[in-house]
């Protein structure tokens, strides 16, 4: 429910074509009726790359190319807050381009992994602790059994 509130507060939601192919998300806002009445519009749906024709999501915008150009285009459409829900490749692209104002991460008391498990960012890791990106935690909240961390640069 918390993530759907974040969606509702956003002007647009972005995922990559890989997420569309693997998860087939609808990218809709699903809130209880009383909360839904306060937020009567759905965010624009943005897909980096091309969504398959049979995908559940019906993107308002499909984009391939420079992320800065995409943000300019979305700004011209009135998008002031973009929620990036992409997988590791999209997350890395936005992070490396310095286009993230705030990270919202959920930590659950559950573990999974393995040699082929996807990490938060695609690509090679940092060679040493000196190469780590360090953000600043601006909020921590308990959401059911999980924790939500808000981190800024």
Task: Tell me what each language-model feature is.
Residues 1-153:
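Enzymes that bind and transform nitrogen-containing heteroaromatic metabolites
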């Amino acid at each position: 429910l918390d993530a759907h509130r974040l969606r509702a507060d956003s002007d647009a939601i972005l995922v990559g074509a890989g997420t569309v192919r693997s998860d087939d998300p609808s990218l809709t806002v699903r809130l209880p009726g009383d909360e839904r009445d306060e937020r009567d519009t759905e965010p624009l749906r943005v897909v980096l790359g091309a969504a398959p024709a049979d995908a559940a999501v019906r993107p308002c915008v499909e984009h391939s190319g420079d992320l800065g150009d995409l943000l300019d285009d979305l700004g011209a459409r009135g998008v002031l807050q973009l929620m990036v829900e992409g997988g590791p490749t999209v997350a890395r692209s936005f992070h490396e381009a310095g286009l993230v104002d705030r990270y919202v991460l959920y930590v659950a008391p559950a573990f999974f992994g393995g040699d082929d498990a996807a990490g938060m960012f695609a690509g090679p890791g940092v060679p040493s602790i000196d190469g780590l990106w360090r953000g600043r935690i601006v909020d921590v909240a308990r959401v059911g059994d999980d924790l939500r961390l808000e981190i800024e640069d």
